Amino acid sequence: MVKRIEADNLFELTAELVSASSKLHKFLDQKNLPQPSFDAPAPSVALNSANKPYYDARSAIVEAAEQLIRLVRGPRDTLLALSFEHCATASMQVVFKYKFANHIPLHGSTTYSKIAEAVGDGVTTALVERTIQHCASFGLFETIPGAMLLQCYLVLLVTDPDLEAWMYLSAVIAYPAGAAIPKAVEQYGVSHEADESGYGASIGRKIAQFQRFREPDGKKDHEMFARAMRGIAAGGAYDFRHAVDGGYPWHLLAEGAGHLVVDVGGGPGHVAMALAEKYPSLRFQVQDLPETVQVGAKNCPEHLKSRVSFQSHDFFTSQPAHEVQDGEGIVYFARFILHDWSDKYATKIVQQLATGLRPQDRIILNEVVVPEAGQVGRETERRMHDRDLLMLMNLNGRERTQSAFEAIFASVTPKLRLQRVIHPEQGELSLIEVTLDGVELPAQANGVNGHANGTNGVNGH
């Protein structure tokens, strides 16, 4: 990850900006990729180790530019600018609800009155004009006198339905939930319960978000949520392939008597199947809700069915007995599970995995590990804390620092020991390896620590 830029004067920050811009320009030029442009999508650069220089340079540009803006604004104007940021989401709520972008030609222009007429529902030309012009002020639309031209940013709301779903989720569901955090605290205190979050307070009900999504009139929001999760996971920093190819030595688990990998809350088994394809000596069991594992079992490729099984299971209950050979270990793999839950319930989930854990077994959590203050660039740090606040407002869940994970591991019986945290290059989720307290992993297994390139020890950032 890019380290924090510590420059604190105008010319030092400008130099950082020029240096990082030069590196990004050089990388794109060498790869024969287009340079950044307001008139075209961003260059398509795969998230992998080979392209690390590009992403490092891009992060450094954003970090230096944001520092520069804060510096020249000064503290008072920085606070005032921040106080108006919610207005952007307010405009976006109107844009998403009435699908303004769908009523603008992909190539060409239209008028505010034509958009209002196409939308109907009592939407006036004045409302369209005011919200469009506000969005245009931060680059989402481009306006011309008497008409409105669709700018490349908003084309994505028409051509990329998964991104549209994520933006909808942010503006229409998360924005009111975040605003209702103080109301929820006033009603319930600082709660560990999912039905006492900002989300429930924002809709005037004591209800958990996922419970609300299962109600008949919550189906649209549930569908948008599913699309948003699919979109954020596809090819980006949350892509599940980072868990498969991101530096964890899965091949070592096949040594000796081998391991059974139990994918706890594994959905339809996409991660287990990808691992099974790559590591033919390992066996897998996918656990999830009955209807989910039925889909997984149906879609599992025939050549994997002998090594990938499916079982309905509630991860708040004890693990069932597993058929293992003499000496064969068990790996309990849980991806993106704990962050949905407060410490109270995350501890209960880990406790069910700790009970019955043997010295040859281990737990691998695939979760965000929030860096401690000052360890990474401010943009990265803010992004991690943004995710944490999303979990708080929607579910009373939490993205955790390494020390927060360790506190959970120390609180269960038997106690657990954090062995290492591996952070895949360009991936957002770390691989957190845990064993019984007192277990020493073989020296060979300990050879991969921190980043996928084997540096930085257990911290991984």
Swiss-Prot record:
Disruption phenotype: Abolishes the production of cercosporin. Leads to yellow-brown mycelia with significant export of colored compounds into the agar. Coiled coil: none annotated. Its EC number is 2.1.1.-. Induction: Expression is positively regulated by the cercosporin cluster-specific transcription factor CTB8. Expression is also affected by nitrogen and carbon sources and pH, and is also controlled by another transcription activator, CRG1, previously shown to regulate cercosporin production and resistance. Keywords: Methyltransferase, S-adenosyl-L-methionine, Transferase. S-adenosyl-L-methionine binds at residue 288. One of its GO terms (biological process) is methylation. Pathway: Mycotoxin biosynthesis. The keyword S-adenosyl-L-methionine applies. The active site is at 339 (proton acceptor). Transmembrane segments: none annotated. It is an enzyme of class 2 (transferase). Pfam families: Methyltransf_2. InterPro entries: COMT-like, O_MeTrfase_dom, SAM-dependent_MTases_sf. Belongs to the class I-like SAM-binding methyltransferase superfamily. Cation-independent O-methyltransferase family. COMT subfamily. O-methyltransferase; part of the gene cluster that mediates the biosynthesis of cercosporin, a light-activated, non-host-selective toxin. The perylenequinone chromophore of cercosporin absorbs light energy to attain an electronically-activated triplet state and produces active oxygen species such as the hydroxyl radical, superoxide, hydrogen peroxide or singlet oxygen upon reaction with oxygen molecules. These reactive oxygen species cause damage to various cellular components including lipids, proteins and nucleic acids. This is O-methyltransferase CTB2. It comes from Cercospora nicotianae.
